[in-house]
Design a protein with these regions (language model features):
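A residue-level marker of the well-folded mature domains of exported/periplasmic proteins
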Residues: 29-399
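Core hydrophobic alpha-helical transmembrane segments of single-pass membrane proteins
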Residues: 12-19
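C-terminal motif of bacterial Sec signal peptides marking the signal peptidase cleavage site
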Residues: 21-24
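Bacterial N-terminal signal peptides that target proteins for export
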Residues: 1-11
């Protein structure tokens, strides 16, 4: 308790500085509402947290709410202390951005029933069933898939023969992941399947850093994949480590959470990201107008919650038109990311038993829920956070 009290006092001072730092910039309407944002890492160095902060500040400018921002809050007691201090300061909504924040946000929600506590990437909103705790994510697997299509087109342009075929040696990609969680596995599988739709014999090695943000580990991981012959690299880790390693090596890179073109002008291709501004505006609308907020909110291309960056000049010729056509197929339902006809698991065709998520997800799925129906896996339809956590053929985990 003494430790928690010390954290509360330090958090109070820093959070108050956050209020003064941003609310003076609001040029839109003025709302009598404070909203708190808790970030795992400093936004200056983490592409993941930078994406959240920019979206939050954009929503604050457009709606006029008073923003409280606290960075570098670890996945422990400090998160609960920060969330509760924000509630004490009068925040009507508190949002946290990292998977490991969830238990501490739930604890804060129990103590402050009149405050809305919203959490990105979490999985427990339905099972804990608190009236003031919510999860949110987006169908980023579709964005990852399109980024993979972009990667496949680059491999085909760079290494394809007269018929467009790419040798096995050149059809090899690498992927730097943070943790072997469903969020990461779903993302790299989507990316891989997008590339596979263009280069059928593509393979991919994956290595994990076991940290969301560690620039030197991510750089070392990318260098390891390059030494194994990867001709293109992507990542689900939050620093510039992997993109910078690709820039030095002159190997194409597909980034995440935002463009790295400024840092990596010779090798950046495209980036997919979740645009959180629509969600921030949605939760504010629900709060001030007493509307019901979804327990599991899923953003999409349609509502602006999923985005691709501009394609760099390093992309293959015709990439933008090709990818846009694939995007339309995803949106109209004529193509599905996890189509069972496009991958196997241990040499077998996918079945419900092979792909059903494990019990660690904490979600109480209704009796009879089928994840594999109509010829594809229904990602992010039964909860907001990704659930696909199976290693498919063609992807090798090297850790």
């Amino acid at each position: 308790m003494k430790k928690l009290s010390r954290i509360l006092l330090s958090t109070a001072a820093l959070s108050l500085m956050s209020i003064g730092g941003l609310t003076g910039c609001n040029k839109g309407p003025s709302l009598n509402l404070k909203v708190g944002l808790i970030l795992l890492h400093p936004a200056k160095s983490s592409t993941y947290d930078k994406n959240f902060r920019e979206a939050f500040e954009r929503a604050a400018r457009e709606l006029g709410f008073k923003a409280v921002i606290k960075e570098n809050i670890d996945e422990g007691d400090e998160c609960q202390a920060t969330a509760e201090e924000m509630a004490e300061q009068g925040c009507g909504i508190v949002f946290a951005d990292s998977f490991g924040h969830e238990d501490y946000m739930i604890a804060a929600a129990r103590n402050y029933p009149d405050v809305m506590f919203c959490h990105a990437t979490g999985v427990q909103a339905r099972s804990v069933n608190l009236p003031n705790f919510y999860n949110a994510f987006a169908s980023i697997y579709q964005g990852r898939y399109l980024a993979g299509v972009t990667a496949g087109l680059k491999l085909k342009e760079k290494y394809g023969d007269a018929n467009g075929a790419v040798s096995d040696a050149n059809a090899k990609m690498g992927y730097v992941g943070a943790y072997p969680y469903a969020e990461v596995k779903s993302g790299y599988t989507s990316f891989f399947l997008g590339a596979k739709s263009v280069v059928p014999n593509v393979t991919m090695e994956v290595t994990f850093t076991n940290e969301w943000y560690h620039e030197s580990k991510e750089k070392t991981a990318a260098e390891l994949l390059l030494s194994h012959g990867a001709k293109l690299i992507s990542q689900h880790a939050d620093s510039y480590g992997a993109p910078n390693a690709c820039e030095v090596a002159g190997v194409p890179n597909v980034s995440y959470n935002g463009s790295t073109l400024k840092n990596c002008p010779k090798t950046f291709l495209v980036s997919s990201k979740i645009n959180w501004t629509p969600y921030f505006k949605h939760i504010v609308d629900c709060k001030i107008n007493n509307k019901t907020l979804e327990k599991d909110y899923v953003g999409s291309f349609t509502d602006g919650g999923v985005e691709l960056s501009s394609f760099s000049k390093n992309c293959a010729k015709g990439t933008a038109e090709y990818v846009n056509n694939v995007k339309q197929e995803l949106l109209n339902g004529t193509r599905h990311v996890f189509d069972v006809n496009t991958f196997t698991i241990g040499g077998q065709a996918p079945t419900e038993a092979l792909v059903k998520p494990g019990p660690y997800t904490f979600t109480d799925y209704p009796e009879g829920t089928l994840f594999l129906e109509g010829g594809y896996y229904h990602e992010s339809e039964f909860r907001s956070a990704p659930s696909f956590d199976v290693d498919i053929d063609g992807i090798s985990i090297i850790d």
